């Protein structure tokens, strides 16, 4: 059987870069990792609670964390940043306070920046969120997959593969369904491939969603 490696880890250093940039002593490494998870969870929870688009999406593509001795710089890449920027200073300050409270960091300055993605639906995380919303609303999985592919075509991507696994449409036996459009060269390291795997809770149980998007070839 083919062993499937994570496409992002496979391409680190060539077409993909790390989402956390910092150095730590070996003994302190786990603390840094835990801190990163707290930051990401805190931001996602805040966005979920306070901001809702009509379709119920957060629109966060990724969160990059850069740490220096006296500063933690957080860059949030969003597909729909106007949600956080509508009354920008208040929203961002509130988010900053929440993260600082969560981390309990006294001697470090925290800075949050928000960057807009030019093609939101060319990002697998936002697409996975879109599909999850559709499945929760009991839209047929095939319809949701096809709609997602239509949205990526507008974002000028070269190929996409979408896979949904679990008790699809409430069937007794779990199965895997997938659909591919265009090229998705997973074995080519030079190919810039974005990948996301997430879960969605439906009334029948948990479904797994995986999305591969072939963005460009270097």
Curated annotation (Swiss-Prot):
Top-level taxon of the source organism: Eukaryota
The KH type-2 domain, residue ranges: 47-118
InterPro entries: KH_dom-like_a/b, KH_dom_type_2, KH_sf_prok-type, Ribosomal_S3_C_sf, Ribosomal_uS3_bac-typ, Ribosomal_uS3_C, Ribosomal_uS3_CS
Record's keyword terms, sorted: Chloroplast, Plastid, Ribonucleoprotein, Ribosomal protein, RNA-binding, rRNA-binding
Molecular functions per Gene Ontology: rRNA binding; structural constituent of ribosome
Localization of this protein: Plastid, Chloroplast
Gene Ontology terms describing biological process: translation
Keyword rRNA-binding: yes
SUPFAM superfamilies: Prokaryotic type KH domain (KH-domain type II), Ribosomal protein S3 C-terminal domain
GO cellular component: chloroplast; cytosolic small ribosomal subunit
Subunit structure: Part of the 30S ribosomal subunit.
Family the entry assigns: Belongs to the universal ribosomal protein uS3 family.
PANTHER family in UniProt: 30S/40S RIBOSOMAL PROTEIN S3 (PTHR11760), SMALL RIBOSOMAL SUBUNIT PROTEIN US3C (PTHR11760:SF19)
Protein's name according to its UniProt entry: Small ribosomal subunit protein uS3c
Organism of derivation: Crucihimalaya wallichii (Rock-cress)
Gene encoding the protein: rps3
